[in-house]
């Protein structure tokens, strides 16, 4: 998982070395530098992660294959001697633990299910010239005392009927480590 994420971050122009990372046992919390454009996380990053996971899985037996839930949010955090804390971190983990996200991945033949906070969807997804808001499904999340609206996407296996029509906008990123090229496009 670490190698796939490192390659995906680097391929999208976000230096893995500059990201704060904390192993959380069965998962990983990664915080990108604040200067990293949030739009990359909905335009290129999901496609890069999915491609890296598929490449990993193609060379592994079924029991070693990886499918991933990914939560996206932005906000203020506090660093202390024990790591990172704050309401933004709490919300991100509530989104990640949401049964509806687990169900989205379980029902998908793909390798990635992604959830964004309501704020991230409204401010980043809707304002991106590449990300397709129609590829996201609005859901209600209620986990550990947190109730909120979130948006789920399955970047490598969209929900049926998720598309818009019109002109095409394309972005490309190349991973110097793996040599793979990732492309994201949106019909507008």
Residue ranges of model-derived segments:
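Catalytic beta-strand-to-alpha-helix segment of the class III nucleotidyl cyclase homology domain
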Residues: 35-139
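Long, low-complexity intrinsically disordered regions enriched in small/polar
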Residues: 161-188
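Residues in well-ordered beta-strands of folded domains
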Residues: 73, 115-117, 140-142, 153, ...
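A broadly conserved detector of short glycine/acidic/proline-rich loop/turn motifs that flank catalytic sites
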Residues: 118-120, 156, 187
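Catalytic NTP-binding/metal-coordinating core of nucleotidyl cyclase/transferase enzymes
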Residues: 1-40
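Intrinsically disordered, low-complexity terminal regions enriched in charged/polar residues
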Residues: 129-166
């Amino acid at each position: 998982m670490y190698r796939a994420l490192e390659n995906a971050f680097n391929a999208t122009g976000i230096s893995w070395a500059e990201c704060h990372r904390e192993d959380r046992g069965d998962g990983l919390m990664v915080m990108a530098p604040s200067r990293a454009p949030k739009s990359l996380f909905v335009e290129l990053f999901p496609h890069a992660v999915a491609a890296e996971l598929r490449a990993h899985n193609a060379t592994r037996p079924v029991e070693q294959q990886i499918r991933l839930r990914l939560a996206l949010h932005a906000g203020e955090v506090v660093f202390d001697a024990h790591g990172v804390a704050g309401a933004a971190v709490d919300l991100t983990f509530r989104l990640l633990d949401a049964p509806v996200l687990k169900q989205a991945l379980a029902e998908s033949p793909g390798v990635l299910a992604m959830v964004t906070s309501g704020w991230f969807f409204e401010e980043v997804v809707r304002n991106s010239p590449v990300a397709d808001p129609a590829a996201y499904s609005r859901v209600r999340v209620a986990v550990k005392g947190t109730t909120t609206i979130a948006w789920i996407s399955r970047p490598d296996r969209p929900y049926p009927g998720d598309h818009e029509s019109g002109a095409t906008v394309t972005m490309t990123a190349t991973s110097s480590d793996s040599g793979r090229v990732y492309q994201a496009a949106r019909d507008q």
